[in-house]
Amino acid sequence: MTSPLRIALVAGEASGDILGSGLMRALKARHPDVRFIGVGGPLMEAEGMQSYFPMERLSVMGLVEVLGRLRELLARRKLLVQTLIDEKPDVFIGIDAPDFTLNIELQLRRAGIKTVHYVSPSVWAWRQKRVLKIREGCDLMLTLLPFEARFYEEKGVPVRFVGHPLADTIPLESDRGATRAELGLSVDGPVVALMPGSRGGEVGRLGALFFDAAERLLVERPGLRFVLPCASPQRRAQVEQLLQGRDLPITLLDGRSHVALAACDAVLIASGTATLEALLYKRPMVVAYRMAPLTFWVLKRLVKSPYVSLPNLLAQRLLVPELLQDDATPEALARTLLPLIEDGHAQTEGFDAIHRILRRDASNQAADAVLSLLGLPLSL
């Protein structure tokens, strides 16, 4: 190729900015004159992204917020598609944010531009008909998890499993003692991490439940200590309110979920992406979740997977206990977690095997997959 390689990327949130910057760095190592255009956050801009508008304009969550910004989002997407068709990049890479990026990929592919989607939406679990749109709009799907790749292979979508960047970042073994010393916790006494979620609704539904379970654990193990990472100042205030009137020996952290996990012996955790982090730190866990009864009723009928937590989806078996809705009682949570504080070997052995599968140098794998799609050498 005589002219410099031009790659368009769009990320819609902070996690996508992290993935995008790693991919850009790996691509630059192979093709130093590559030019990047599209939409990215500060990390992608630091790697040389010429962002058409701030990524924050795409970072919306929740139905109400999306509806309030729908006109702006649709207008930005329309303008972005036209700009990219005019620019004719060698490839477009949509990073996560499927409700925004999949439509862009479809239109660009119809215009003759190669397209890649990085991070699979949860089509294997529900709304499986979305795979038809993915197959039509996507030249290549890059997945972080192996079971996702198997799903796409069965559906006839070109796919490459690249591994998970978290598995590259988190060491195979972590230093529990050093982390406890950093937090001023005893090296010898048992510590349980409580992780009721990062959103206000999750903490509202699970916070008091987790604290009730913690009080029952404390009766059985009087020397027990607890640690809870708060995702934001708002969540910390919410947690402090829920703790009023309780006498739990608990250390609250501002963010730093990795510190809480490195320090603990076991974790009581909300179902979600944090369970993957707990798995990678090899911490035995009990997964719990509660949602509005109607939401639970609807999801039970829509979701095709037998499991809800990532550890079980990755293991393809019931590796960690899942206590959902009415099954998630303080007594059941405490009773299920208690033996894991002493011996979670059956879980952690499985966690280690999964960590090694996911640890594939994801950014470099993704860069090689993109260059192979373009028929370019993997290095100059």
From Swiss-Prot:
Gene3D superfamilies associated with the record: Glycogen Phosphorylase B
BP-aspect Gene Ontology terms: lipid A biosynthetic process
Protein's UniProt keywords contain Glycosyltransferase: yes
Single GO MF annotation: lipid-A-disaccharide synthase activity
Keyword annotations from UniProtKB, A to Z: Glycosyltransferase, Lipid A biosynthesis, Lipid biosynthesis, Lipid metabolism, Transferase
Pfam families tied to this protein: LpxB (PF02684)
Catalytic function, reaction form: a lipid X + a UDP-2-N,3-O-bis[(3R)-3-hydroxyacyl]-alpha-D-glucosamine = a lipid A disaccharide + UDP + H(+)
Pathway: Bacterial outer membrane biogenesis; LPS lipid A biosynthesis
Family matches, as InterPro entries: Glyco_trans_19
UniProt-listed Enzyme Commission number(s): 2.4.1.182
Family statement drawn from the similarity comment of this UniProt entry: Belongs to the LpxB family.
PANTHER family per record: LIPID-A-DISACCHARIDE SYNTHASE, LIPID-A-DISACCHARIDE SYNTHASE, MITOCHONDRIAL-RELATED
Role description: Condensation of UDP-2,3-diacylglucosamine and 2,3-diacylglucosamine-1-phosphate to form lipid A disaccharide, a precursor of lipid A, a phosphorylated glycolipid that anchors the lipopolysaccharide to the outer membrane of the cell.
Descriptive protein name: Lipid-A-disaccharide synthase
Organism: Pseudomonas syringae pv. tomato (strain ATCC BAA-871 / DC3000)
Gene that this polypeptide is encoded by: lpxB
